[in-house]
Amino acid sequence: MTIFTERLKELRLKKGLTQKDIADLVHVNRVTYTNWEKGKREPSFENLIKLADLLEVSLDWLFGRE
């Protein structure tokens, strides 16, 4: 796992959201989101921004730069 995938899961759980909840809010299917969280695929820049906004963190924090 990478810092990104660990933090993505950590924030999702902290906010009490399911993988499907986040997928719906970002407008992707659950399998796509699950692949991001498992590190099998990487979200587009547009979806990274959506995730950061939704989870109320910076992209720098999501990637361990902060």
Predicted regions and their residues:
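Residues that mark the N-terminal boundary/hinge immediately upstream of a DNA-recognition element
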Residues: 7, 18, 44-47, 58
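A short, Lys/Arg-rich alpha-helix, primarily the initiator
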Residues: 1-14
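Short alpha-helical DNA-recognition segment
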Residues: 17-35
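DNA major-groove recognition helix of helix-turn-helix/homeodomain DNA-binding modules
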Residues: 27, 46-61
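DNA major-groove recognition helix of helix-turn-helix
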Residues: 37, 55, 63-66
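Alpha-helical residues within the helix-turn-helix
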Residues: 13, 24, 53
